[in-house]
Amino acid sequence: MGQKVHPNGIRLGIVKAWNSTWYANTKEFADNLDSDFKVRQFLTKELAKASVSRIVIERPAKSIRVTIHTARPGIVIGKKGEDVEKLRKVVADIAGVPAQINIAEVRKPELDAKLVADSITSQLERRVMFRRAMKRAVQNAMRLGAKGIKVEVSGRLGGAEIARTEWYREGRVPLHTLRADIDYNTSEAHTTYGVIGVKVWIFKGEILGGMAAVEQPEPAAQPKKQQRKGRK
């Protein structure tokens, strides 16, 4: 059987950034890793309906900074920022250091593999036909400018006795081109027949220049020069 390397793992440090960025000595490493896991577990459960794409954790100077990438920032922030303040306090308790939470909006959820996979699983749980859900996700992604997309579902599809795997692809998805910007993620649909797994690969184009091109900061807005009034 042909085994495939994880599309995100093979591109780390080339065109993909890590979801946790911090340095620690041998003694602190395990504690930091454990608290990262618990923070992610808590936020994923708490923000299940907020369309969270990814959670990035940084640890600058005995503190923790969490960036939540979401398609629905209003749900995360809450009325006058009440909800995000509650999250901040719990995260600080879990990590044992002062916490800061930033919210980043996902502008095009149709081009985010995690959000596409979650959308398909929610449709499968509502008993939508799996082929229709797959085709709709593929069409939406291609319409918004994806170079290619592949969706795979596996399990007791349509309540069949024997589990099987089906996939649908449009465009090109070059899994072994390291400079290819491929967003990959998975999700699980818990149906009455059992669990159905969903995998999504979205190819957004090739990144030339490696991590330098990915992490290039946006140019700061320049202050407008005041025009001198001409003499009359």
UniProtKB/Swiss-Prot annotation:
Name of a matching Pfam family: KH_2
A GO term, aspect molecular function: structural constituent of ribosome
GO CC list: cytosolic small ribosomal subunit
UniProt keywords, alphabetically: Ribonucleoprotein, Ribosomal protein, RNA-binding, rRNA-binding
PROSITE patterns (alphabetical): KH_TYPE_2, RIBOSOMAL_S3
InterPro entries with a match to the protein in the record: KH_dom, KH_dom-like_a/b, KH_dom_type_2, KH_sf_prok-type, Ribosomal_S3_C_sf, Ribosomal_uS3_bac-typ, Ribosomal_uS3_C, Ribosomal_uS3_CS
GO biological process terms held by the UniProt record: translation
Domain KH type-2 span(s) in chain numbering: 39-107
Superkingdom: Bacteria
Keyword Iron-sulfur (UniProt): no
Protein family (similarity comment): Belongs to the universal ribosomal protein uS3 family.
Chain's role: Binds the lower part of the 30S subunit head. Binds mRNA in the 70S ribosome, positioning it for translation.
Oligomer status and interactors: Part of the 30S ribosomal subunit. Forms a tight complex with proteins S10 and S14.
Protein's recorded name: Small ribosomal subunit protein uS3
Species annotation: Yersinia pestis
Protein encoded by which gene: rpsC
